[in-house]
Structure formats: structure tokens, C-alpha cells
Amino acid sequence: MEKGVYIIGTSTDIGKTFISGLILKKLREEGRNAGYYKAVLSGAIKDKKGLIPLDCEEVMEISGLKESYENMVSYILENPYSPHLASEVEEVSISMEKIKKDYKSVRDKYDFILCEGSGGIVCPISFSEKKLMLEDIIKEFNLPIILVSNSGLGAINHTVLTVSYLRNLGLKVKGIILNKFNKSDIIHRDNKKIIKELTGVNNISTVPKIEDIEKYDLNELNEVLYGI
């Protein structure tokens, strides 16, 4: 298995943070020394102690990982905008060198790194000073991608287009996860079949709407992680 994966979504609010937490939980329960990293996080909540990155909180709560925010995220922004706009409004300069340095620190501490992207693949990280896209970070880290999509109407279009775009960039798609999958829904079942045929991606896992994480069988993720 690779030394890490990059989790991205077909769009924002698709559930990639929740999925990141599930994957990290599985890896850690298997005995892997697995950590989490996100280059830029926007939409943090401000309290008396500063900015609270909710994505990190969610991942730690699900996975059991205990880590400081500064070791998980390079840039924490308050406004719930695309990273390039949030950083511009908050007058924060995004540096690829800092991102590379922080990622190396996480990589030195953990054997496996689960990186989470910001939104979909066409996501500007910085635009006003020097243009930096999410794809640039993924290329720099040289990690395969797990793509998270919804399971309902629109999933075929969004997923196939994203996979095509990723391949045009020369990025490796390790697998696909269809989130909030309902086995009794004919649309969901058909979407999985058509997506597999149109993309040629064989490693597709499904995650249902989960009320109690402890009751979820993490082995359902084996296909996307291990191809079994």
C-alpha cells in the first residue's frame, strides 16, 4: 500500500471529511501509524482561544487521532469561502514552501498520511499573488487520489467528469467512494455500475448514511483501499 492518499470530493460538502475520518479510523485500528494533513482549511469557528478547524475536530473525533491543529493544517482561515478568497479577504499569504515543509513534518512523524483537499479538484488555493491550485499540491505530494461522490442523481456526471479531469492532469485515481449509499435505491445501484464502466475504476466502495460509527463495518472500505 502507498504511503498516503489524497481525499478529494466531486464538489464541496460531499462528505469527504467524514470519509477521511472513517478511513483514518480503519487504518489506525489495523495498527497503522496513520496521520492527517490539510493544506488550507476555511470556515473555521472563532472562540476565545482562536480559530477552531472543524474538519480536524471531526476527523479526530471519528478516528481517535490526537494531534495539535498546527500539526494537521498549514493555514486555518475563518471565512467559509474558497481558500483563495478567504486568504485574500483575511490578508493571509499562502506559501507552497510552508505547505511542503509542514507536510514533510507530518510525513516524518507518521508512516501513512491521509491528506484532505479543499472542495473539488478545480480549487484555487491562492490567486491574487501567485497562482496555486489544489492540483499543484497533489502533484507535489505525488499521492494517489480517492474520490468521494454522492450516490444519487448527478453522481455519474460529476464523478466521470472529475475522473477524466484528474487523468488529464496525470494524477492517479486509486478509487471512488459513493457516500450515503442506499442499497435499496435503484438509482444508487445503477450509478455505481455505470460509473465503474465509464471510468474504468474498479475499486469502488460505498458508505451508507451512518448513524452510529461503531456499528459500521470498516471492512466495507477494503475495496477502495486494498482492491479487495
From Swiss-Prot:
The protein here is known as: ATP-dependent dethiobiotin synthetase BioD
Query: Per UniProt, where does substrate bind?
Result: 42
Briefly state the protein's biological role.
Catalyzes a mechanistically unusual reaction, the ATP-dependent insertion of CO2 between the N7 and N8 nitrogen atoms of 7,8-diaminopelargonic acid (DAPA, also called 7,8-diammoniononanoate) to form a ureido ring.
One GO cellular component assignment for this chain's record is: cytosol
Main localisation = cytoplasm
| GO molecular-function terms, A-Z | ATP binding; dethiobiotin synthase activity; magnesium ion binding
Q: Which organism is it from?
A: Clostridium perfringens (strain ATCC 13124 / DSM 756 / JCM 1290 / NCIMB 6125 / NCTC 8237 / Type A)
* Subcellular localization(s) per the UniProt record: Cytoplasm
Q: Which family does it belong to?
A: Belongs to the dethiobiotin synthetase family.
Write out the catalytic residues in the record.
Answer: 38
